[in-house]
């Protein structure tokens, strides 16, 4: 049923999404160049590093709390929260590591994180800025970046890209390590 004229629709959609993400990354690179911001400067951003540590710590702490308040096992709860918005990766890894049921929950948690950022940034922009960029996690540098930029201006773009980039590098390792350790 997923095939039309012997072509897998999922494969085509995956390729289109991949090409769109590459185009978005190219646009981000061009914008950084126009703002005279180097990649080296991004990784020297101490505020971004602090936010990354805070996001990971609070995600894991929340997962521990939720595990004790519900019947979700600790390992599954921590791994669900550690997707950090990257649902195309975390769902696949968590489905392999902790099962299809928790893989689907991972998708919902990561997807809702993205939707909440898109809805909450315009509503709370007067009261919160870097907090919502941190909550966007991996999506701060791609899908949520236009919403963040439109509401907070170009000055916050390097911070958002740095947070997203660092979390994008850390997330796969975090999920694999949690699966091994827990």
Located regions from the model:
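Entry/N-cap segments of selected transmembrane alpha helices
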Residues: 38-64, 103-115, 159-167
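Hydrophobic transmembrane alpha-helices of multi-pass small-molecule transporters
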Residues: 22, 117-118, 144, 172
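C-terminal ends of transmembrane helices
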Residues: 30-41, 66, 92, 121-124, ...
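Helical membrane-embedded segments and adjacent short helical loop/helix-boundary regions
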Residues: 1-59, 74-85
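Alpha-helical membrane segments and immediately flanking helix-loop junctions
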Residues: 76-116, 127-162
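Juxtamembrane boundary at the C-terminal end of a transmembrane helix
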Residues: 173-182
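Short alpha-helical packing/oligomerization segments
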Residues: 4-8, 14, 124-131, 135
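Short helix-capping/hinge motifs at transmembrane helix termini and TM-loop junctions
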Residues: 6, 70-71, 125, 179
């Amino acid at each position: 049923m997923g095939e039309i004229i012997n072509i897998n629709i999922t494969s085509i959609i995956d390729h289109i999404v991949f090409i769109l993400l590459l185009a978005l990354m190219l646009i981000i690179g061009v914008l950084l160049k126009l703002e005279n911001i180097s990649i080296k400067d991004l990784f020297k951003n101490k505020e971004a590093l602090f936010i990354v540590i805070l996001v990971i710590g609070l995600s894991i702490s929340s997962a521990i709390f939720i595990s004790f308040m519900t019947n979700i096992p600790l390992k599954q709860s921590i791994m669900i929260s550690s997707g950090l918005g990257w649902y195309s990766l975390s769902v696949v890894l968590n489905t392999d590591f902790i099962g299809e049921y928790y893989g689907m929950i991972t998708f919902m948690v990561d997807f809702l994180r993205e939707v909440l950022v898109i809805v909450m940034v315009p509503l709370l922009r007067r009261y919160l800025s870097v907090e919502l960029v941190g909550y966007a996690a991996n999506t701060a540098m791609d899908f949520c970046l236009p919403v963040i930029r439109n509401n907070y201006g170009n000055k916050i773009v390097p911070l958002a890209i740095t947070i997203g980039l660092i979390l994008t590098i850390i997330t796969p390792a975090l999920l694999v390590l949690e699966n091994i350790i827990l």
